[in-house]
From Swiss-Prot:
Pathway membership, UniProt: Amino-acid biosynthesis; L-methionine biosynthesis via salvage pathway; L-methionine from S-methyl-5-thio-alpha-D-ribose 1-phosphate: step 1/6
GO terms, molecular function: S-methyl-5-thioribose-1-phosphate isomerase activity
Assigned keywords, A-Z: Amino-acid biosynthesis, Cytoplasm, Isomerase, Methionine biosynthesis, Nucleus
Protein name (database record): Methylthioribose-1-phosphate isomerase
Protein's job: Catalyzes the interconversion of methylthioribose-1-phosphate (MTR-1-P) into methylthioribulose-1-phosphate (MTRu-1-P).
Keyword Iron-sulfur: no
Gene Ontology biological-process entries: L-methionine salvage from methylthioadenosine
Organism encoding this protein: Populus trichocarpa
Signal sequence residues: none
Pfam families in alphabetical order: IF-2B (PF01008)
Positions of the catalytic residues: D259 (proton donor)
Amino acid sequence: MATNPSNGLEGDNTLQSICYHRGSLKLLDQRKLPLETTYLDIKDASDGWLAIREMVVRGAPAIAISAALSLAVEVSNLENFNGTPVEAASFLAGKLDYLVSSRPTAVNLSDAATKLKEVVSKAAAAASNCQSVFQAYIEAAEIMLADDVASNKAIGSYGARFIQNQQKDPTKLSVLTHCNTGSLATAGYGTALGVIRALHGEGVLQRAYCTETRPFNQGSRLTAFELVHEKIPATLIADSAAAALMKDSKVSAVVVGADRVAANGDTANKIGTYSLALCAMHHNIPFYVAAPLTSFDSSLSSGKEIIIEERSPKEMLNARGGLGEQVAASGISVWNPAFDVTPASLISGIITEKGVITKTGMDDFDIKDFINKAG
């Protein structure tokens, strides 16, 4: 992966984690933010896998889009592939399986791979040459990129409206969020941070609060970076300060993202989310999850079935999420899960691009019913 310095902005002056033009993909190296803005050239699926695994790009939607586009770039520039359409489809399916192995918890990646396999399988059945299959794949991956931005804006709109309707004073809101769920975690705009952006755009957001999100510091490095860039009034807090902030009545609502949502609404998200949900319930503060339907996994009946990725001990032993000098005692053992699961019983509502999923007296959500009605 080659580096390419950039100012990190597209023509509309928004932060971009993914810069794609057919045959070319550049990913913002988020490990170096906010002090350095560097893009890495992604030439093929191997580069994409490494970028995802090493946290160059992170955030469930961005991971899925980056994986799909890394393979699109590879096949755009592929020479001397002389196989049949069926062999082309098999080649793509194998690459997609490889990309899915980069990070197992976020369902968006496996969901995207499944959909893309279906596209190439259908294309292979009708194609007379391998290039037609590759072209079908490239176009499908590009549609996913555009669709992600549109769904994020819908999430922001639905979430802002719903939260305002649930508040006694909808004109003065303060919202707490965790990890990074904005333009840097998606193809653009963001999920939970998109809701905050929408509230700010409507002039009703007094303040956004973001946690540091240890140990990789996505909140302090990335969310704070986005909030400052967007000129949204914001305050950074330590993860351990959230309960005190809520006790002082400074939080109207908590909005977080999701890496995987089970059929009952149990939600896997960045480690520390479960703690925030418990604090919010204790202080009678609504706790919302904002996620596209691609983050839902109906094959899992509950969060107990979600595989939780464990990260390197170095992220905790060393400063800057493992990138800096050692700060912990040598020889200490480390438990470093990247995610935790928040039970549906602690979640007030799940904000999607099709509307807000609510409960009717039950601890669980009826995700299947909502999806069926939403079409």
